[in-house]
């Protein structure tokens, strides 16, 4: 059995570690709310943009419009945009998305395509750059804002557009982590190019709010109601031709799709970090309790041994 000093030092170390993990949990919890607020702020623009595109689509078939972002050509080269975090300590968040990319990459090769990677986040960059003999990397992006903004998505959008318009890629897919709940998220694959505009907000979207009760962190959730009262009127007249409108709107729509993926990934990362740090805090508390019990037993054994030695000495 370890001596009392070693046990006491370990108890102090575990308690200090618990303070750190608890602080990280609270910081992540606060940032999750910020990430969700950012999604809400960007949603009105995304919703309006989608409705304008839907209105144009109702008047002219996209297939008849001469826009390079809508053109569907024979697919040979496929770019995969992979979104991970810059940091760890977020459970299986980074591991799950990297596994999803590896599986998708292998599927495309098996089907006869030529995939390549556009990596976002230091974790993906570090992992795949160490395996350059197996993966083709086109470009990398790192050190984005913790709560992504349009500026963060602009650089990725420009790179994706350049790859597609130069025909270096015939299709672009994005692999990111979809935020479901504070304790649940899942890697998903979405086709970015060629574009196929559809609604942005879903009927069952939920927003999770962090509250406190009796000094404990709680989660409240509420459904988002889609507002159909501000739909564009059916008799609206566009001064420009559909081609001109789409050339202006489609890049914006693409950037918004990428921004949405970045925001969902950021919210998922923070939620995973909050959960991981919460589990770490609970484990540290349990370990400290076990060590305290061990310390008390060792101390009791030491006292008993001293008493026996005193009694034995007096008997002599």
UniProtKB/Swiss-Prot annotation:
A GO molecular-function annotation: ATP binding
GO cellular component assignments: plasma membrane-derived thylakoid membrane; proton-transporting ATP synthase complex
Topology in membrane: Peripheral membrane protein
Predominant location category: membrane
A Pfam cross-reference name: ATP-synt
Keywords for the protein's UniProt record, in alphabetical order: ATP synthesis, CF(1), Hydrogen ion transport, Ion transport, Membrane, Thylakoid, Transport
Record localization: Cellular thylakoid membrane
Coiled-coil region(s): none
InterPro entries: ATP_synth_F1_ATPase_gsu, ATP_synth_F1_gsu
Domain of life: Bacteria
Similarity field: Belongs to the ATPase gamma chain family.
Subunit: F-type ATPases have 2 components, CF(1) - the catalytic core - and CF(0) - the membrane proton channel. CF(1) has five subunits: alpha(3), beta(3), gamma(1), delta(1), epsilon(1). CF(0) has three main subunits: a, b and c.
Role, per record: Produces ATP from ADP in the presence of a proton gradient across the membrane. The gamma chain is believed to be important in regulating ATPase activity and the flow of protons through the CF(0) complex.
Name of the protein in its database record: ATP synthase gamma chain
Protein source organism: Prochlorococcus marinus subsp. pastoris (strain CCMP1986 / NIES-2087 / MED4)
